């Protein structure tokens, strides 16, 4: 990681990203600066969440900025690799995938402080009797997208550390595709338990979108590195600075 990366990471969030891209001249002479993210939630929620960033970047860069939702995690990777977008919000795993797919031509630009100590949670219905990871044996368990760091890769890693092999020890392994769908699968009873991004869970709780008297967290993972904003290496260095 570069000195720029560490400097920008300390600032975090919208101002961090905007200041990292503060050179307003676009060497590509493009009409629209395009931003996307791994689709952790419904497209409508992504558009709402990233709306302030779009407006801020438009003011800062002096050009039109468009948020472009993608269908799934691999699509976010391919969008940056093929330079269909300019800036992407990746999880740790999708960032690695993009680096590999591009031949090491994806550059991490910014990371929030909280993403250096990120966590996932496992949730279940409170009357299920599930209180530990070991009690997931023989149960139906859902992850998010197979390419999700916080919704699959890291939770699976911690399960393996606990001696649990999902395909061997669980009755069924499901993939919901997104964190909000993961929560819904537990609420509806389609699965017994599930793993997801802690920030999405906290937002659902804060917005009263889930009844924690019925569904709640029974395990929180240790911390790990996760999200970052990335650009293609072909973006001029002056722009990144």
Language-model features: locations:
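N-terminal hydrophobic or amphipathic helices and topogenic motifs
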Residues: 2-8, 15-21, 27-75
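Bilobed "Venus flytrap"/periplasmic-binding protein-like clamshell domains
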Residues: 31, 36-58, 70, 93, ...
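Periplasmic-binding protein-like
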Residues: 34-39, 114-121, 209-241
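General small-molecule cofactor/ligand-binding pocket signal
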Residues: 66-68, 173-174, 216-218
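Short helices/loops that flank or line small-molecule/ion binding pockets
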Residues: 74-88, 101-102, 134, 178-199
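Acidic, polar ligand-binding/catalytic clefts
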Residues: 78-135
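A ligand-binding cleft/hinge motif common to bilobed small-molecule-binding domains
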Residues: 92-103, 155, 160-161, 187, ...
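Short hydrophobic/aromatic-enriched beta-strand-loop microsegments
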Residues: 106-111, 169, 194, 214-217
């Amino acid at each position: 990681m570069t000195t720029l990366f560490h400097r920008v990471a300390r600032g975090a969030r919208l101002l961090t990203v905007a200041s990292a891209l503060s050179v307003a001249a676009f060497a590509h002479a493009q009409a629209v600066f395009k931003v996307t993210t791994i689709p952790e939630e419904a497209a409508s929620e992504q558009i709402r969440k990233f709306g302030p960033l779009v407006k801020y970047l438009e003011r800062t860069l002096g050009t039109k900025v468009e948020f472009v939702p993608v269908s799934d995690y691999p699509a976010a990777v391919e969008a940056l690799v093929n330079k269909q977008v300019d800036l992407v919000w990746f999880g740790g795993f999708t960032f690695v995938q993009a680096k590999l797919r591009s031949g090491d031509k994806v550059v991490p630009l910014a990371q929030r402080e909280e993403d250096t100590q990120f966590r996932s949670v496992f949730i279940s219905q409170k009357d299920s009797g599930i209180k530990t990871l070991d009690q997931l044996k023989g149960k139906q368990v859902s992850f998010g997208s197979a390419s999700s760091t916080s919704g699959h890769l890291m939770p699976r890693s911690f399960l393996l550390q606990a001696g649990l092999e999902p395909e061997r020890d669980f009755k069924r392994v499901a993939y919901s595709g997104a964190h909000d769908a993961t929560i819904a699968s537990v609420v509806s009873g389609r699965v017994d338990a599930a793993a997801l991004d802690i920030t999405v869970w906290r937002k659902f709780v804060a917005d009263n979108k889930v009844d924690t008297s019925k569904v709640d967290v029974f395990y929180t993972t240790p911390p790990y590195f996760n999200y970052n904003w990335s650009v293609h290496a072909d973006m001029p260095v002056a722009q990144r600075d």
